[in-house]
Design a protein with these regions (language model features):
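Phosphate-binding P-loop
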Residues: 1-3
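AAA+/SF3 P-loop NTPase mechanochemical coupling elements
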Residues: 128-129
């Protein structure tokens, strides 16, 4: 039996984490196995990328293209290491952000062509969708 992948999208402070925690508790109370994750993050590489982008001086002033590719690298690892295996095992994966955030933050806000963002995202996620 395949699992389920649910993503929560929205701006900072809109309640994504609160809703994820509530749904996770409800699903677990129903006997479901739930994996909670976030982007960037969820793997050692993802957490490193998160730290680089948010806290490291090397992440300051990064070009939009470099930022997009770091998110894509993190996502590729995340899908292959955590998300796809959990779904294959019948687990429910709840993710704080995924593709839509990249489309908005790197595509729209950083003015990268949406077709390029989509192509890179699709390459990163492979057959997950």
């Amino acid at each position: 039996m395949n699992g389920l992948f649910i993503t929560f999208e929205g701006g900072e402070g809109c309640g994504k984490s609160t809703q994820i925690a509530a749904l996770k508790a409800r699903l677990e109370a129903m006997g479901k196995t739930v994996v909670q994750t976030r982007e960037p993050g969820g793997t050692a590489l993802g957490e490193y990328v998160r730290s680089l982008l948010q806290h490291d001086d090397a992440g300051q002033g990064m070009s939009p293209e470099a930022e997009l590719l770091l998110f894509a690298a993190s996502r590729a690892q995340h899908v292959r290491e955590l998300i796809a295996p959990a779904i294959a095992q019948g687990q429910i994966v709840l993710s704080d952000r995924f593709l839509d955030s990249t489309t908005v933050y790197q595509g729209v806000a950083r003015a990268i062509d949406s077709k390029k963002v989509d192509t890179i995202n699709q390459f990163a996620i492979g057959d997950i969708n």
